[in-house]
Every structure is written in C-alpha cells, then in structure tokens.
Swiss-Prot record:
InterPro entries: GPCR_Rhodpsn, GPCR_Rhodpsn_7TM, Histamine_H1_rcpt
Outcome of substituting F435A: Decreased activation by histamine
Gene3D superfamilies referenced in this protein's UniProt entry, alphabetically: Rhodopsin 7-helix transmembrane proteins
Organism: Homo sapiens
Statement: the UniProt record of this protein carries the keyword Transmembrane: yes
Residues exposed to the Cytoplasmic side: 51-64, 124-144, 212-416, 470-487
Protein name: Histamine H1 receptor
Renumbered residue ranges of the record's region Important for agonist binding: 107-112, 424-428
Phosphoserine: residues bearing it: S230, S344, S347, S380, S396, S398
SUPFAM superfamilies: Family A G protein-coupled receptor-like
Keyword Cell membrane: yes
Annotated glycan sites: N5, N18
Length: 487
C-alpha cells in the first residue's frame, strides 16, 4: 500500500542477500498461511462490492469511497499478493521483464490508490461534520465519482517512472535480469520523497482531520444532551388529566390542563362546555411533515377543543389521554395512554432526507356540535393557548429528533472511519519506519523483519472489509443475507 512497497524486499541492494530455495520445506507452512490470507482478502472485498451493488440502502455517496478502497484492496489480494508469494518461492525472477513490470505497476498503483481512497474518505467525513449544510449541496455522486477518478489518475502516474525511468534519468546501476526491481531501486532521494508524499503527509493530514471530526461530533453530542434535558420526549408530550385524588393546588399554580378543564360560567350560570354525551368533531388543523418533493410523510391532527370536557370529568377516570391514531389520521381517546407508535415508525431515511422542512398548514379553526347540542363558545382561549404551547414543544422536539438522527449517522460514520484509519496506520507504519531506516542505512536490512512489515501492510487489505459490517448495520445485514446467516 505504499510507494516503495513489497518489491523492496526483493529488489533493493540493501536486501540483496534475500535468497530462498525453490519450494523449500521450511517455506511451505508460511506459503499456506499467506495463500489463505490472499484468498480471504479476495473473497471479502468481492463480498463488499457485491453487497454495495445488490443493496439499495448502500447506494450512498459515502459508500462510493468504500467501493474505491475495496477495488484497490481487491487488486492487492488478486494480483500483488499471489505474485509476491510466487517470487518468495523462487530463488530468482524467471517470469520475464514484462510480467515483472506489470506486477510492480499493480503493486505501486493499488497501494497508492488505497492510501488516497482512505484520504478522500476522511475529507468527506470531515466536511460532512464541519460544514453539513454547505457540503450537502456539493456532496453528490457525480462529484464523488470525479474525486475518486482523480485519486486513481494520480495513482496511475506511478506507471511513468516504473516504465520510463531510463528515458528521464541517467541509469546509475546495472539492471539485474534475475531480479524483479524498478530502475530507481537504489535512488534514495526519490524513494524518500515519494514515501513522504504517499504516506507520511496523507497520514498526518488524516490524523488532523479525524481529530477535528472527533471534536465536532463530541461537541454535537454534548449539545444534544443538554437539549434533551430541556425538551420532553414524544412519550412525555401528552395531555395529563386532572389528578383523580383531588390533591389541593396552591392558588395561581394551576396547570394549563386544569385551567382548560375548568368549566367557565356564562351569564346565566350555565356551563359553556357541552355535556359528555356530545360527540366531538376533530379540529381541522393538520400538521404536515413534508419533504422537498411535497410528498406527505405523516400527519398529526390537533385534538378538538371539545374533547377538553372529556369522559374523565364524567367517569372519574384518570387514564384518559389524547392519542394520535396514524392509521385513521385522527385523534382518539385511548385509555391506555398516549400512542406514540406512529411517530416512532417514521424511518430514519424519511426523516433524514437531503433537504427537509417542517410546515404547518393552518386553517380556520371551527368547532361544531351535533344539531341540538349547543355550540362551543369562544371563551376557550386558554385551551387554544395550551394547544399552541404543546405544538411548539412537539415541533421543537421533532427538529431535535431529526438532528439527533443525523448526528447518530455521522457518529457511526466517524466510528467507521476511525477503525479504518487505525487499521491503516497500525498495518503500515512499521513498514515505513523500517523503510526510512534502511533508506539511509543500507547495511541495516533484516530480511525476516522486512518481509513481516510488508505482509503486515498487505493484511490491511484483508482487515478493511471486516471493518465495514462491524461499524455499519446495513453492511452487517446485507452480509448476513448474502451468506444466508440467520441472526
């Protein structure tokens, strides 16, 4: 996955003493292990690509970068690893110069593309967290695809020095036909410069970006926690009836519900509110949660004013609540408590569209009673105020709920990126530390340690597809469906 990669093991003069006999018995257990890693790498990355292709929920902009990373890892597992194993079994390269150049090109290109894929994935997560609204308009599949193509184009620039080094630079050493090596294998300044550009600089930038992402997500979570303490949940936004035990209340401390329930008297001493036997009619003031295409997602209807009288006053029940019945689109009194199931069924995909708005369609509020039952007077301003108060709290909580879903998604994405970066750095930093040492100390090469660091870097291509289902529920479900694994 690096610029100066696995080929250094067999190409550099500093590791010139690395010789193995053909099919040595001591190498066979190692070959079996490395071949298993190779097969697992290919299988897992093919599984990732098939999962993204077959599952619509995975057709997101962010997963385009995952696809790019999987393609690079697939090349490592399908081309680079097998030829490295083959070269390990041979005492010299006997497959010809063209095949050698092909292997070196795939090694350098795939390694660089893997690094750049992680890098642009990190930038995407950073902008999604730091500039959510501005980046939302910019974050399209077309732009993401163009960015990925740009990363691969830069990676393919490695073909130029691999195939044409002698056309641009003077040859300083004699090429050895029995070894597969680049023409710049002994050019220390070039290898150090490319190592810095390909690994050290992107890694430092990714660490800086991820520190910013972690800080932003943490601040958002803390902010949301403070908001949640001051806002009721959906289950708490319900109209509580009067205490059936008749607990005494201090003057001036009556709740809006109690004020609403108190029967005002008209001039004749009669009750303004109608009797419990009267059938209430719903107040036509729908609240519409709408998306950009004006598709109606859900409706919550305000309760009718004449429900205020309630059976609670007539029957003495303390369990009468006003509940939203989503299936009929109207309010019903439910003796089991407030039904919030309809609100909780709004899926995250519905609530988290690229652009959402909350709009309220107000109409003239009219309440009628059945013929001969009398009419509700306009003296229920207190009740209407309580309706408005409840609606404002509900709408405020709904916005925070949507914001919470968005932050949960970003937090999961940040977690996934964190695991990918951790695996990337832990797998490749040993190789690059060792590489910088032997770049300046040609006699400091230990062939076994060098080989270990190279294959540790290759194992990063095996670990990446294991990280996705661990951090993404959609990947996990899709993998289980494809592999026919029952939960």
């Amino acid at each position: 996955m690096s610029l100066p990669n696995s080929s250094c093991l067999l190409e550099d003069k500093m590791c010139e003493g690395n010789k193995t006999t053909m099919a040595s018995p001591q190498l066979m257990p190692l070959v079996v292990v490395l071949s298993t890693i190779c097969l697992v790498t290919v299988g897992l990355n093919l599984l990732v690509l098939y999962a993204v292709r077959s599952e619509r929920k995975l057709h997101t902009v962010g997963n385009l970068y995952i696809v790019s990373l999987s393609v690079a890892d697939l090349i490592v597992g399908a081309v680079v690893m097998p030829m490295n194993i083959l070269y390990l079994l041979m005492s010299k390269w006997s497959l010809g110069r063209p095949l050698c150049l092909f292997w070196l090109s795939m090694d350098y290109v795939a390694s660089t593309a893997s690094i750049f894929s992680v890098f642009i994935l990190c930038i995407d997560r950073y902008r999604s967290v730091q500039q959510p609204l501005r980046y939302l308009k910019y974050r399209t599949k077309t732009r993401a695809s163009a960015t990925i193509l740009g990363a691969w184009f830069l990676s393919f620039l490695w073909v130029i020095p691999i195939l044409g080094w002698n056309h641009f630079m003077q040859q300083t050493s004699v090429r050895r036909e029995d070894k597969c090596e680049t023409d710049f294998y002994d050019v220390t300044w070039f290898k150090v410069m490319t190592a810095i550009i390909n690994f050290y600089l992107p890694t430092l930038l990714m660490l800086w970006f991820y520190a910013k992402i972690y800080k932003a997500v943490r601040q958002h979570c803390q902010h949301r926690e403070l908001i949640n303490r001051s806002l009721p949940s959906f289950s708490e936004i319900k109209l509580r009836p009067e205490n059936p035990k008749g607990d005494a209340k201090k003057p001036g401390k009556e709740s809006p519900w109690e004020v609403l329930k108190r029967k005002p008297k008209d001039a004749g001493g009669g009750s303004v509110l109608k009797s419990p036997s009267q059938t209430p009619k719903e107040m036509k003031s729908p609240v519409v949660f709408s998306q950009e295409d004006d598709r109606e997602v859900d409706k919550l209807y305000c309760f009718p004013l004449d429900i205020v009288h309630m059976q609670a006053a007539a029957e003495g029940s303390s369990r009468d609540y006003v509940a939203v019945n989503r299936s009929h689109g109207q309010l019903k009194t439910d003796e089991q408590g407030l039904n919030t199931h309809g609100a909780s069924e709004i899926s995250e995909d519905q609530m988290l569209g690229d652009s959402q708005s909350f709009s309220r369609t107000d109409s003239d509020t009219t309440t009628e009673t059945a013929p001969g039952k009398g009419k509700l007077r306009s003296g229920s301003n207190t009740g209407l105020d309580y309706i408005k108060f409840t609606w404002k709290r509900l709408r405020s909580h709904s916005r925070q709920y949507v914001s919470g879903l968005h932050m949960n998604r970003e937090r999961k994405a940040a977690k996934q990126l964190g695991f990918i970066m951790a695996a990337f750095i832990l797998c490749w930093i040993p190789y690059f530390i060792f590489f910088m040492v032997i770049a300046f100390c040609k006699n400091c090469c230990n062939e076994h340690l060098h080989m270990f660091t190279i294959w540790l870097g290759y194992i990063n291509s095996t670990l990446n597809p294991l990280i996705y289902p661990l951090c993404n529920e959609n990947f996990k479900k899709t993998f289980k469906r494809i592999l026919h694994i029952r939960s």
